Amino acid sequence: MNGGDDIIHQAVRLKIMAALNAMMPKAAAIDFTRLKALVGTTDGNLGAHLETLQKAGYIQVEKRFQDRKPQTLVRMSPAGRRAFSDHVAYLREIIDSADR
């Protein structure tokens, strides 16, 4: 059994990565406000977790203006997709071994 990813394993970050993964390939990115609603957290908490994921290279954050309003878009990077997939496989191994 391979080890899990300590960065992704934290509950809020796991929800973020799951939400981003679920959006693929339908949407290239998720708006910060929508992601906050999906994850069920505050602006500050989401921002801190996004920073951790971005530093790990798991997500890309794009800040831009739309209709003169700031907009933050978040997308999963290829490295993030691989890390999330590996972590899901790790969790499945744990669950499968518990069912035996």
Predicted features by range, described:
Residues A11-L14, A56, Q71:
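Structural motif
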Residues G3, N21-A22, R82-R100:
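Amphipathic alpha-helical dimerization/coiled-coil segments
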Residues T33-K63, R68-K69:
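Canonical helix-turn-helix DNA-binding module
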Residues K15, Q60, R75:
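Conserved beta-strand segments that form the floor/walls of ligand-binding pockets within enzyme
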Residues G4-T42:
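N-terminal helix-turn-helix DNA-binding core of bacterial DNA-binding proteins
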Residues H9, H49, H87:
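Histidine-centered active-site/metal-ligand motif
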Residues Q66-S85:
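Basic, amphipathic "hinge/linker" alpha-helix immediately C-terminal to the N-terminal HTH DNA-binding motif
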